[in-house]
């Protein structure tokens, strides 16, 4: 074999290796998205803790849907950033994130993903063939404890949530460290606050945000700060936290999980 031919083969291999690696990564991402655990949440009725404009608690008929069993982790978000580099800190549009986006991000396998904007959370869920939950979907599942589908009147449970959130202030958050609720969903109340699709409904004033921004969603203007049960202090804290953020902002205590609609479900 001539040296010239050997050189061509060597150059070809150097070109082929990254292409081959890219193909392997793309295949792994397809299987990874399919393997993420989603749990079916049955249809039912939610008596929301949010009041309607007349001051009455809102009753909502919930269609069945699927919810991610755990919040998104840093490692999972790293895979998304690899596949969608426009969401990396150095490349993301300043309209989509502020300077603290991806702060303290080290890609840990079981550490919950925080410091992510609403825009980026939505993009991630789309990447996972899913979407962010609505507030009512989130509240519906979060009402459960390990044994009951609706444990919101349990004073001990509510105090336990507050205690867990206070302890979280002094440590990093790792997913799946406690028992799941009765639906099989982990970390709904005690680990982080979570983005929801219609978080703009948390604004107490209809003009609290620029009406031209993506925060002006269908439910914007509903006074979600009017709570039916003031004993739900942990839930009120969550609403207050989300209402204080713009969709481009992030926080060390706000992460997210995704849901999937079920075709034909009512």
Name the predicted role of every residue range:
Residues 72, 198-200, 263-264:
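Acidic glycine-/aspartate-rich tracts in secreted/extracellular proteins
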Residues 100, 104-107, 114-239, 247:
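Functional-site microenvironments in short loops/helix caps that host divalent-cation chemistry
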Residues 1-14:
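N-terminal secretory signal peptides that target proteins for export/translocation
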């Amino acid at each position: 074999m001539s040296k010239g031919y050997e050189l061509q083969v060597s150059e070809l291999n150097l070109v082929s290796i990254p292409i081959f690696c890219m193909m392997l990564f793309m295949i792994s991402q397809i299987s990874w998205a399919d393997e993420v655990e989603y749990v079916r949440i049955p249809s039912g009725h939610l008596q929301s803790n949010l009041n309607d404009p007349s001051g009455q608690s809102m009753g909502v008929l919930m269609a069945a849907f699927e919810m991610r069993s755990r919040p998104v982790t840093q490692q999972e978000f790293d895979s998304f950033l690899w596949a969608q580099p426009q969401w990396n800190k150095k490349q993301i549009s300043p309209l989509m994130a502020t300077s603290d986006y991806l702060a303290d991000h080290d890609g840990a396998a079981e550490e919950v993903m925080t410091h992510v904007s609403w825009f980026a959370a939505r993009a991630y869920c789309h990447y996972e063939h899913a979407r962010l939950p609505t507030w009512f979907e989130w509240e519906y599942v979060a009402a459960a404890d390990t044994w009951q589908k609706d444990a919101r009147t349990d004073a001990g449970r509510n105090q336990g949530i507050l205690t867990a959130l206070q302890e979280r202030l002094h440590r990093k958050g790792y997913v799946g460290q406690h028992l799941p609720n009765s639906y099989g969903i982990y970390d709904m109340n005690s680990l982080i606050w979570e983005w929801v699709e219609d978080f703009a409904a948390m604004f107490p004033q209809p003009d609290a945000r620029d009406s031209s921004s993506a925060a002006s969603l269908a439910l914007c203007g509903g006074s979600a700060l009017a709570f039916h049960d003031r004993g739900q202090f942990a839930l009120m804290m969550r609403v207050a936290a989300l209402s204080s953020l713009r969709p481009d902002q992030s926080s060390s205590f706000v992460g997210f999980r995704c849901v999937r609609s079920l075709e034909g479900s009512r």
